[in-house]
Amino acid sequence: MHMPKNIKVKPHKLEGVYIGNNKFLLTKNLVKGQKVYTERIFKSKGEEYREWIPFRSKLASAIKKGLKTWPFKKGTIVLYLGIASGTTASHISDIIGEEGIIFGVEFAPRVLRELMFVAKKRKNIVPILADANQPETYQHIVVQSDVIYQDVAQPHQVEIFLKNLRFFAKPNAIGFLAVKARSIDVTKDPKVIFREVERKLREAKLQLLESIRLDPYHKDHMMFVVKVPKAW
């Protein structure tokens, strides 16, 4: 591996996120010398940073689009539904550190195998082969979580999200729901679909904190951020 390039790094206003050369997002690499996907690795003042590419991560694109709600810090407990091969999760792993934990639910065995390689080095990621629509099948593994993050391309993704919040959300937990309009209904205008998602979240008595369109990074996607009320 070639030597990481030295760059100028400053903290972003969101905890655990950094900005490189006033341009790109970074997280401090929890496992030095290790890449997870095609990200570049940089050095600054003896620390190693990984580039967080918004075109590869919906959470990074939400940050680029002005996300304000940020529950991730050292020690945060995260349930990640639809973790895939761990691109976004690896950056959350950098931020929450060894004191935190990510329970990563993934339905596709082939993809989960890729995640296993990431989790081997990153002890704060727990891969779970399961269907996010059946939280009862993994309730013996997952603990009550500070954050529930969902990126599941299913028509009934809102229902899956609500079900998991009911099972695993601590009071005042924050939920992130990344919605791809076309996976709900190809025939409908994305705006109509997003309004429908918002209505369902409000009907469930969740506090809607933010809704952010993820264009141009992810076409026809929106990130919804909710807070679970204390007595829900």
Swiss-Prot record:
InterPro entries: Fibrillarin (IPR000692), Fibrillarin_CS (IPR020813), SAM-dependent_MTases_sf (IPR029063). GO terms for biological process: box C/D sno(s)RNA 3'-end processing; tRNA processing. SMART domains: Fibrillarin. S-adenosyl-L-methionine binds at T87, T88, E106, F107, D131, A132, D151, V152, A153, Q154. One of its GO terms (molecular function) is rRNA methyltransferase activity. Keywords: Methyltransferase, RNA-binding, rRNA processing, Transferase, tRNA processing. Its EC number is 2.1.1.-. It comes from the Archaea. The keyword Heme does not apply. It is an enzyme of class 2 (transferase). Belongs to the methyltransferase superfamily. Fibrillarin family. Interacts with nop5. Component of box C/D small ribonucleoprotein (sRNP) particles that contain rpl7ae, FlpA and nop5, plus a guide RNA. Involved in pre-rRNA and tRNA processing. Utilizes the methyl donor S-adenosyl-L-methionine to catalyze the site-specific 2'-hydroxyl methylation of ribose moieties in rRNA and tRNA. Site specificity is provided by a guide RNA that base pairs with the substrate. Methylation occurs at a characteristic distance from the sequence involved in base pairing with the guide RNA. This is Fibrillarin-like rRNA/tRNA 2'-O-methyltransferase. The gene is flpA.
